[in-house]
Amino acid sequence: MVHSFVGRLLIASVLCGAVLAERSVAGGQDDWPQWRGPLGTGVAPRARPPLKWSENKNIRWKTELPGKGHSTPIIWGERIFLTTAIPYGPAVKPRLPSRPGAHDNLALTHHHEYVVLAVSRKTGKILWQQTMHKDLPHEAGHVTASLASASPVTDGERVFAFFGSRGLYCLDPNGKLLWKKNLGEMHTKHGHGEGSSPALHGETLIVNWDHEEESFLVALDKRTGKERWRVARPEDTSWATPIVVEHAGKPQVIVPGTKRLRGYDLASGAVVWECAGLSSNIVASPVAANGVVYAGSSYDTRALLAIRLDGAKGDITGTKQVIWSRERGAPYVPSPLLYGDSLYTLRHYQGVISRVDAKTGNDQGGPFRLDAIDNVYASPVGADGRIYVTSRDGITQVMSHGERIPRMLAVNRLDDHFSASAAIAGRELFLRGERYLYCIAEE
């Protein structure tokens, strides 16, 4: 059911004073410089990736990766950057998490090194591999998690790699360390691990640090790593990545949380607005376009909200700033995909995709069954009028976008397991599996 607070208000009717959500990282049309792509929405607007592939078709190259990581590869020019965690040394006595409610966790039996990789986009060759840190993790995370789940971000001159409790690192494109910063030790809910990626806007790098102790949001000078500001957050563990949007010429950092979804002034860290309504265990990252922010969660209760930024000040819970809210189709692990006027969401274990009118919150038909898809951690991506959904067991189902009833266009299988989200650039699709990095391109 959709709850409308402004009747038949259409976002398109917002006048020239409307907020425009701008991409945080300025890259070329063939780049994927951050976690959810050039627009931060999961869409590559000018890309034309392949429709069909298999282990024997349309694989330009396939590179075996060391260690394990669920970070999405990022692409700038002819280089791909990604992170991984590599176990080393003899096994130690297992150390199980001690967090309250811990379940389904990995036992800690090995030291790890935390590594940034650069890969040739043309050949798949690993160009360099730099170890940033080594330790025996204090928390290993959920059995399905990795110790390198935060995706890097780049402006083309610097690569920012975040390993949470193991540090934040800034490198040049050739792997030279420019600066590093230790933000402390994170203690996550149930010991399920860390996952929020940094966000970059202009000269400022943003890191959200929500955990079971003193949570905070911090802004850093991207050139030096020096803190510009740090603000406390009265929140428990979350795994979502912040986004940065422009409002009336001023960028805001949008961060979801169990207690409040908040917009912070990028310049000062001051809270501009906040809104209640999400659930606990915030994993999905928000998306934004045309002056509206969309955020959702569905761990214990389900909620999907659309927030109009024009006029948003203070506590906007239950006000006309909440254009619409709904319970059906709320995301959990995969983040929403915002493609044109359609907002796509997935529940990670159901094999069902919902399509919502971004203007009204009403269903655009569906939800639609993805017959080939079961469990999904990767967020869906869109390009060339298609939606790509990749399951954990290596199946990518492709469906059409922009049609009243979407067509299921292809089912593609690879011999790997996938939790990282896809990256799209030009005519190529990049899939990062548990063992391999694939470049998928028409032969």
Feature-to-residue mapping (PLM):
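Noncatalytic, solvent-exposed loop/strand surfaces
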Residues: 22-443
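Bacterial N-terminal signal peptides that target proteins for export
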Residues: 1-13
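Hydrophobic h-region of N-terminal signal peptides that target proteins for export
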Residues: 12-23
